[in-house]
């Protein structure tokens, strides 16, 4: 979504070619497949115990698997948080720079719509960090 928005701001005519629904569906499907593939090993690390005929699922792995779980979690943090955040950050910084650049032949401050767009960019980045970290 961020890449699509970035292309729309930086290269509006170019983004029309990549903004088609079929292309978006393919990208979304590929992302979901990647996420499911990356998260499947969590099922291997899950531990359960039985207390009073109730099965309890623990949020940590067995002791002997814990070092592997830490390594797996670190890779997943990099792949599923840091990489998307870097892409989002670069896209939104490029968009903000373009929006903050004064239009040719104008003087004075930024139009209200551009200020609101830059504020929205800051909010999106903040929400991403708060929700996914």
Swiss-Prot record:
Keywords: Cell membrane, G-protein coupled receptor, Membrane, Receptor, Transducer, Transmembrane, Transmembrane helix
Subcellular compartments: Cell membrane
Membrane topology summary: Multi-pass membrane protein
InterPro entries: GPCR_Rhodpsn, GPCR_Rhodpsn_7TM, P2Y2_rcpt
Gene Ontology BP annotations: blood vessel diameter maintenance; G protein-coupled receptor signaling pathway; phospholipase C-activating G protein-coupled receptor signaling pathway; positive regulation of mucus secretion
GO molecular function: A1 adenosine receptor binding; G protein-coupled purinergic nucleotide receptor activity; G protein-coupled UTP receptor activity
Extracellular side: 48-74
Family: Belongs to the G-protein coupled receptor 1 family.
Name of the protein described by the UniProt record: P2Y purinoceptor 2
Source organism (scientific name): Bos taurus
